[in-house]
């Protein structure tokens, strides 16, 4: 693997639209080198018997069965509103025309 240069770091910063001060270039160059060295270590791991996955833990949907239940009648619900207009709830206007 080729070594990361200050020019590489400046290019990545430019592509990411980051304004990276010159005094931080060396720091980021070193950090990127360490990251790439770690990735190189990961590439050496034998994963032939590991099945592909997108999550570290299995995710399942928790569902319940639908049950028919009684709900308050329409008129009772409308009567609970502070203001109503016919069969609708009346709410304060929030947008100008």
Swiss-Prot record:
Q: What class of enzyme is it?
A: ligase
Q: What is its EC number?
A: 6.3.5.-
**Family as reported in the entry's similarity comment:** Belongs to the GatC family.
The record's Gene Ontology biological-process terms are: glutaminyl-tRNAGln biosynthesis via transamidation; regulation of translational fidelity; translation
Q: What does this protein do?
A: Allows the formation of correctly charged Asn-tRNA(Asn) or Gln-tRNA(Gln) through the transamidation of misacylated Asp-tRNA(Asn) or Glu-tRNA(Gln) in organisms which lack either or both of asparaginyl-tRNA or glutaminyl-tRNA synthetases. The reaction takes place in the presence of glutamine and ATP through an activated phospho-Asp-tRNA(Asn) or phospho-Glu-tRNA(Gln).
Question: Which reaction(s) are listed as its catalytic activity?
Answer: L-glutamyl-tRNA(Gln) + L-glutamine + ATP + H2O = L-glutaminyl-tRNA(Gln) + L-glutamate + ADP + phosphate + H(+); L-aspartyl-tRNA(Asn) + L-glutamine + ATP + H2O = L-asparaginyl-tRNA(Asn) + L-glutamate + ADP + phosphate + 2 H(+)
Q: What is this protein called?
A: Aspartyl/glutamyl-tRNA(Asn/Gln) amidotransferase subunit C
* Gene3D superfamilies attached to this UniProt entry: Glu-tRNAGln amidotransferase C subunit, N-terminal domain
Q: Which residues form the signal peptide?
A: none
Pfam families referenced in this protein's UniProt entry, alphabetically: GatC
Q: Which UniProt keywords apply?
A: ATP-binding, Ligase, Nucleotide-binding, Protein biosynthesis
A single GO molecular-function term is: glutaminyl-tRNA synthase (glutamine-hydrolyzing) activity
Q: How does it assemble?
A: Heterotrimer of A, B and C subunits.
């Amino acid at each position: 693997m080729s070594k990361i240069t200050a020019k590489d770091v400046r290019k990545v910063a430019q592509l990411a639209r980051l304004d990276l001060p010159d005094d931080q270039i060396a720091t980021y160059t070193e950090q990127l080198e360490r990251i790439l060295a770690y990735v190189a270590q990961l590439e050496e791991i034998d994963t032939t018997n590991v099945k592909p996955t997108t999550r570290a833990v299995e995710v399942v949907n928790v569902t319940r069965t639908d049950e028919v239940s009684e709900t308050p009648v329409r008129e009772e619900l409308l009567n609970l509103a502070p203001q109503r207009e016919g069969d609708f709830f009346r709410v304060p206007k929030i947008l100008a025309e």
